[in-house]
From Swiss-Prot:
Pfam families: Ribosomal_L3 (PF00297). One of its GO terms (molecular function) is rRNA binding. It comes from the Archaea. One of its GO terms (cellular component) is cytosolic large ribosomal subunit. This is Large ribosomal subunit protein uL3. Belongs to the universal ribosomal protein uL3 family. Part of the 50S ribosomal subunit. Forms a cluster with proteins L14 and L24e. Keywords: Ribonucleoprotein, Ribosomal protein, RNA-binding, rRNA-binding. It comes from Methanocella arvoryzae (strain DSM 22066 / NBRC 105507 / MRE50). The gene is rpl3. GO terms for biological process: translation.
Amino acid sequence: MGHAHAPRRGSLGYSPRVRARSQKPKMRNWAELGDQPKIQGFVGFKAGMSHIVMVDDRPHSATEGMEISVPVTIVEAPQMHVAGIRVYDDSPYGKKVIGEAWISDLKMLESLTHLPKNGYKTDEQLAKIAELVKKGVVADLRVMTVTLTSEVSGIPKKVPELMENRIAGGDMAKRFEFAKSLMGKAVGIKDVFAPGELVDVSAITKGYGTQGPVVRWGIATQKRKHARTGKKRHVGNLGPWNPHRIRWQVPQLGQTGYHQRTEYNKRILKMGDKAEEITPAGGFLHYGLIRNDYIMLKGSIPGPVKRMVRIRPAVRPKNMPKQAPEITYLSTQSKMG
């Protein structure tokens, strides 16, 4: 006798499926780098997609050495301005801030927060951090970076984005000296990543509001006699009589989309500052023209056009070629149809 094979629909690994608190993705893990200090994160804005033709440089691939067509995502990456340093200590309840120092000129943040009238005592705070580093109590060091969204013409937001990015590589003393050298300076995407490198991309996905269980979980619609009740797009059974409650594993309607998602091992195929090389005729749909540095990633990334994306070095990189690929064609045809 046949046996019905009906595994559960949808993954419980993403539950609870609720709206993200902010459009600013959170980085919870970072890769460990070599001996030289380096900023580990960067911020960009999704401009759109295109396709290229490149020579397949993956070893032992069936198309190795041949030209292949590859979909790509273009991300505009304006410069980040380093506004401060923050150091952490490991406590039994997680990381705890034990010191921070800000630059004295923070006019770029006037529209974001209230600034102290007497300014910041930068030198005094840096001396305190240096003493903490010397004592060996600093477990993690990060820089406070500001992205001026007013420099990005493709998005309507003008309030700057303030976030933390980790400094990795070398001992803590080297990291602190490197962070001090960046205070008040601008950092470009080329200072952090290189073509051919693998990165992880985090963003908030496109939101669809409240959707039924068929769209939200992928359950099957009711068939034959069960559909005669007039209800097709609902789960057939909410659970047993006892216990008198519905288990959280039962697929039901609710929020769909607008969740934080991270995609691993996206390869950087191209970087540059000449936007005319990659901008399609008429500009990117719903975005316009790129006026800053850009980064081209292989494949798709989470989120709609104009969404902020955060990029970090891959935490579990695959064995891929580390050099820049050979691109023979880059489509700049109009995306307007």
